[in-house]
Curated annotation (Swiss-Prot):
It is found in: Mitochondrion matrix. The keyword Nucleotidyltransferase does not apply. Belongs to the GcvT family. CAF17/IBA57 subfamily. It comes from the Eukaryota. SUPFAM superfamilies: Folate-binding domain. Its main location: mitochondrion. One of its GO terms (biological process) is iron-sulfur cluster assembly. It holds the Pfam family GCV_T. This is Iron-sulfur cluster assembly factor IBA57 homolog, mitochondrial. Residues 1-72 form a transit peptide. The keyword Transit peptide applies.
C-alpha cells in the first residue's frame, strides 16, 4: 500500500512563486519518535562565509508552547526572570525559568501570539529547546494550579520558527519573501531580543491555506549555530545546563533576559543578591580550537569582528578531530599545569569553534569590577581533552582552546561601567549639597 500523501505549497527564497511538493503523511506519535532520534543539530561541514553573513534557516532545534487565557500574563510574570508587562517587551523578549535556588531550568523567548485564534487577548508563545519542550510543558502544567489559561505544546506542523539575518549592505533574497508572508498575515518577524544585529525570529502559521516558507533552498541550521557560537550566545539545555547553570554566568543578564527591578519570581533571591553583592567570575564565552602553534589572533572589537572571525573557521581542528568530539563538561585547563580547579568547562561546538564556561580573569584579559588584574597571560595556552580517563593506557587526544570576549559584550560592560560611574558621581554631588562628607 502506498503511503498517504498531501499537497503543500512551497516558496523558494529568491521568488514568491509557488510550486507543488508531496510529502508522506506521518502521525504525531511517529513525528515525536523521529524528533528524539534526530538530536544531532549540526552538519559535518562548516558553512560558507556567505551563509554566515546573510541567510534564512528553519530552527528545528526550537519548539513553541501556547499559553492563552485570562491568567496567562499573571502566571508567567511569577515564574520568569523578565518583566512581561514592560513596554519594551511588547514585541517579544528573552527570559528564563529558574529553580527556587536560582538555577536555570529553561531559557526561552516569549512572543505575543498575534497569529492565534484570539490575537492580543492574553495569548503568548514560548520558544524553548525542542528536546525539552515536553518537559517545560509539564513544568507549567504542574504549577498552573487554579490559574485560568490554556496550555498547548504546538506541533511544528502548526507553527514553525525561522531565523533570518543580513550583515551585508544590500537587501537579502529573503527580505521580500518575509515581508510578503507578514503582509499576508501568515507570519510575524521580530528582532532577536538577545544581541543587537543578531537577526530576526520569524514565527510562521503553518495552518494557513498555503505554507509560506518551506525547507527548500534555506540556509543550513548549522550556519545559525556557528553565528551564535562566534557571538557567544548560548541557547538550549546543551549549553545552559538545566538545574546547574546560573543565569548571570549564562549571560542572561547581558542578553536582556533579566529585569532586576520586577517583583517576586521563582529563583529571584539568589539572582538579585549576585547582581548587587557578588562578582560574576565566570561566563559563557566563544572559543576557537587549534592544535599546534600560536593561538589564533582574535580580530579587533567592533561590528566587523564577526566577519573577520569567519576567516578562522575550519571544518576540523586537524584531520579527524572536530569540536563535536569533545564531551560536554570536559575540563579546560592550563597546558602542563593542573589548576586546583579547572578555569573552564567545554559546552558545545562545531568544526573548530564552540562555547565554554570560562573563568574571566584566568582565560581572558578581563579585569573584574573593583579588583586588580587576574592571572591571565597571553602566552598561557589552555587545553581540553577529547575524552578518556586519566591513567588509562591510551591517553586522550587534546586540543588547545582560545577563549575571547565578543565585541557586543564588551560594549555592554562599557555602558554599565559608565552608568555606574555616573550614578556614583551623582551620589557624591547629593552628599556635598547636603553638607555631608564624601568617603
Amino acid at each position: 500500500m502506498q503511503p498517504a500523501t498531501r499537497s503543500i505549497a512551497v516558496a523558494g527564497p529568491a521568488s514568491a512563486a509557488l510550486r507543488t511538493a508531496t510529502t508522506p503523511f506521518i502521525c504525531l506519535g511517529c513525528r515525536s519518535v523521529q524528533r528524539k532520534q534526530q538530536r544531532r543539530l549540526f552538519s559535518s561541514t562548516v558553512s560558507t562565509q556567505t551563509d554566515l553573513r546573510a541567510g534564512l534557516t528553519k530552527l528545528t532545534s526550537r519548539r513553541l508552547i501556547s499559553v492563552s487565557g485570562p491568567d496567562a500574563s499573571k502566571f508567567l510574570q511569577g515564574v520568569i526572570t523578565n518583566n512581561i508587562n514592560a513596554p519594551h517587551n511588547a514585541n517579544g523578549f528573552y527570559t528564563g525559568f529558574l529553580t527556587a535556588q536560582g538555577r536555570v531550568v529553561h531559557d526561552v523567548i516569549i512572543y505575543p501570539d498575534d497569529l492565534g485564534p484570539e490575537p492580543g487577548k492574553q495569548s503568548f508563545l514560548i520558544e524553548v529547546d525542542a528536546d525539552e519542550a515536553a518537559t517545560l510543558h509539564k513544568h507549567i502544567k504542574r504549577y498552573k494550579l487554579r490559574s485560568k489559561f490554556n496550555l498547548k505544546l504546538l506541533d511544528p506542523e502548526e507553527r514553525a520558527l525561522y531565523h533570518s539575518w543580513n550583515d551585508v549592505d544590500q537587501a537579502g533574497p529573503w527580505t521580500k519573501l518575509i515581508d510578503e508572508v507578514q503582509n499576508a498575515g501568515n507570519a510575524r518577524a521580530v528582532p532577536d531580543p538577545r544581541v543587537p544585529a543578531f537577526g530576526s525570529r520569524v514565527v510562521v502559521n503553518q495552518t494557513s491555506s498555503s505554507s509560506p516558507l518551506t525547507d527548500g533552498d534555506l540556509t543550513p541550521e548549522s550556519s545559525y549555530h556557528l553565528r551564535r557560537f562566534l557571538l557567544g550566545i548560548p541557547e538550549g539545555q546543551s549549553e545552559i545546563i538545566s538545574g546547574t547553570a546560573l543565569p548571570l554566568e549564562s549571560n542572561m543578564d547581558v542578553m536582556n533576559g533579566i529585569d532586576f527591578r520586577k517583583g517576586c519570581y521563582v529563583g529571584q533571591e539568589l539572582t538579585i543578591r549576585t547582581k548587587h553583592r557578588g562578582v560574576v567570575r565566570k561566563r559563557i564565552l566563544p572559543c576557537i580550537l587549534y592544535y599546534e602553534g600560536a593561538a589564533p589572533e582574535i580580530p579587533a572589537d567592533g561590528p566587523g569582528q564577526l566577519e573577520a572571525l569567519e576567516k578562522l573557521l575550519k571544518p576540523e581542528v586537524e584531520q579527524g578531530v572536530k569540536a563535536e568530539m569533545i564531551p560536554q563538561g570536559a575540563s579546560i585547563d592550563k597546558v602542563d599545569k593542573k589548576s586546583r580547579s579547572a578555569p573552564g568547562k567545554w559546552l558545545r561546538g562545531i568544526g573548530n569553534v564552540g562555547l565554554a564556561l570560562c573563568r574571566l580573569e584566568v582565560m581572558t584579559d578581563t579585569v573584574l569590577p573593583g579588583e586588580t588584574p587576574g592571572t591571565y597571560s597571553p602566552e598561557q595556552d589552555f587545553v581540553v581533552s577529547l575524552g578518556g580517563e586519566e591513567g588509562s593506557e591510551v591517553e586522550a587526544k587534546k586540543v588547545k582552546v582560545k577563549a575571547f570576549v565578543p565585541f557586543w559584550l564588551k560594549d555592554v560592560w562599557r555602558i554599565e561601567a559608565e552608568k555606574a560611574e555616573e550614578e556614583r558621581r551623582m551620589r557624591e554631588e547629593l552628599l556635598r549639597d547636603r553638607g555631608l562628607d564624601v568617603e
